[in-house]
Every structure is written in C-alpha cells, then in structure tokens.
Amino acid sequence: MTDAATGTTRADTFEDPLVIAGEKFHSRLIMGTGGAPSLHVLADALRASGTEMTTVAMRRVDPNAQGSVWDVLRETGVRPLPNTAGCFTAVDALRTARLGREALETNWVKLEVVADERTLLPDPVETLDAAERLVDEGFVVLAYTNDDPVLARRLAQVGCAAVMPLGAPIGSGMGIRNPHNIELIVEELDVPVILDAGIGTASDAALAMELGCDAVLLATAVTRAQDPVLMAHAMREAVSAGRRARLAGRIPIRRYAHASSPPREG
C-alpha cells in the first residue's frame, strides 16, 4: 500500500530487526572473516554486506596482533562474534570460548565443535555437551549443528540463544541439501534459526530465508568469490528479498495452470 500524503509504501518503511538474546540487529546477514584475499577486500566486503556482526575464529587469530582482522573490525565498526572453530571436543570449545570472553569482553560465542577435519561436520555429542556447560557459565550460545531437528530442539532446550543448522558442509558451496529438515527446525524452535555453512551463491541465501530462517551466516561464498565485494552486496539483497518473500507469503504450488484473471462473464 502507498501513503497518499507521503508517497511512501510499506516496503519503504519496512522494519524487521533480528533479535537474539534481547539484542536487535537490522541486518539478517552475519559474515565470517576467513578466506579473504586481503584485509582491504575483507573490509570492503563487510561494508557491502551491511552486516553488523562477523565471526572470528579465536584459535586462529591473535586478539593482540596488529595489522589483522581486528583492525578491519575496528575500522568498519562490525561487532566480532568469537567462534570456537577448530575445536574437536567440548573441553576445547569451553577453553576457546573463555579465551574469547576474556579477550573481547563479551559472553557471546558461536559454538562450533566438529567431528573431523575431512568433513568438518558438527559432532552432535560434543556440541550438546559444550552448549549445556557454556550456558551454565553464562554464555550467550549460538550453536552450529547438523540439520537434525531433534538435535536442534535439544540445543534450544539447554538454553542456546540461537541454533545454526548447516545447509551443507562448510565451504562446500552446495547450497541447502535438505530444505525439508530446515523447515522442520524452523517450525519446531522458538529461538532464532540461522542457516550456517554451505551457501554458494545469492539464491541459496534467499532460499534459506524463504524457508523461514531468521538469518544467514556465510563466509566462503563471499571471501572466495571472483568479486567478493560484489558478491557481498548480492548476499545482502538476497537475504532481504528472501525475508520479505517469506513474510509476504508465496502462492501455493498447483499441479495445473490457474488463470491469474477470471474469465469475463456474459
């Protein structure tokens, strides 16, 4: 609808913040920092994406280093989200999360505990164990997990602030391999669902939002694109378009044609 007095439409004034643990974010795109060809390109890509938060692997980046990703985040004003990437046990994840809390003075953490280096698939047993213990220590946990509705429900039950099912293995670019399970997770959970891993291009990000995800987290799809800055902008628009399409409501799928205009009578 258009406001006759101002000429603006609902789309022009659309406000739909992402809320995690009571904090609001205007962008529903969360970025990662790994794989960028240079810090300059990373900074430009973060700006183009419109993101307000980006993950940083605490085991791989020195918080005190100069000329690093930390300088980029300070320059762009993007909030860092400590990540336990590279952890294979709950014990390692707890140690890394505590390091992030001390170094960055935040109790937010993206929990990532993988089973092996070949697949980088989440270890469900270690992930659930780590999540429960981190929540008990007062962390705001955003948990990376498989596209398993039962495990997603358990993670929410132990107190995770957001659950982050994968679309496909990390860095694979295969898109969303099991959209049905993602829909089941969205239907089941009362906490935000963030599609994490496997995104290859903008249409994958749009699909995640159309399936009902609250946000998308991606890194490789942007940082290793031929033009990372242009791809970051594409992802920004895709996430926005997918979210609006979800809220607008798609038409039902029909087996046969259905005329858009009724036949004239008489």
From Swiss-Prot:
Any one Gene Ontology cellular component term annotated for this protein: cytoplasm
Keyword terms: Cytoplasm, Schiff base, Thiamine biosynthesis, Transferase
Reaction it catalyzes: [ThiS sulfur-carrier protein]-C-terminal-Gly-aminoethanethioate + 2-iminoacetate + 1-deoxy-D-xylulose 5-phosphate = [ThiS sulfur-carrier protein]-C-terminal Gly-Gly + 2-[(2R,5Z)-2-carboxy-4-methylthiazol-5(2H)-ylidene]ethyl phosphate + 2 H2O + H(+)
UniProt keyword DNA repair present: no
KW Coiled coil (keyword) present: no
Single Gene Ontology BP annotation: thiamine diphosphate biosynthetic process
InterPro entries: Aldolase_TIM, Thiazole_synthase_ThiG, ThiG
Binding-site list for 1-deoxy-D-xylulose 5-phosphate: 171, 197-198, 219-220
E.C. numbers: 2.8.1.10
Pfam families according to UniProt: ThiG
Pathway listed: Cofactor biosynthesis; thiamine diphosphate biosynthesis
Class of the enzyme per the UniProt entry, highest EC level: transferase
Active site annotation, chain numbering: 110 (schiff-base intermediate with dxp)
Compartment(s) of residence: Cytoplasm
One MF annotation (Gene Ontology) recorded for this entry: thiazole synthase activity
Binding partners and assembly: Homotetramer. Forms heterodimers with either ThiH or ThiS.
Role this protein plays: Catalyzes the rearrangement of 1-deoxy-D-xylulose 5-phosphate (DXP) to produce the thiazole phosphate moiety of thiamine. Sulfur is provided by the thiocarboxylate moiety of the carrier protein ThiS. In vitro, sulfur can be provided by H(2)S.
Protein family (similarity comment): Belongs to the ThiG family.
Name the record gives this protein: Thiazole synthase
Originating species: Thermobifida fusca (strain YX)
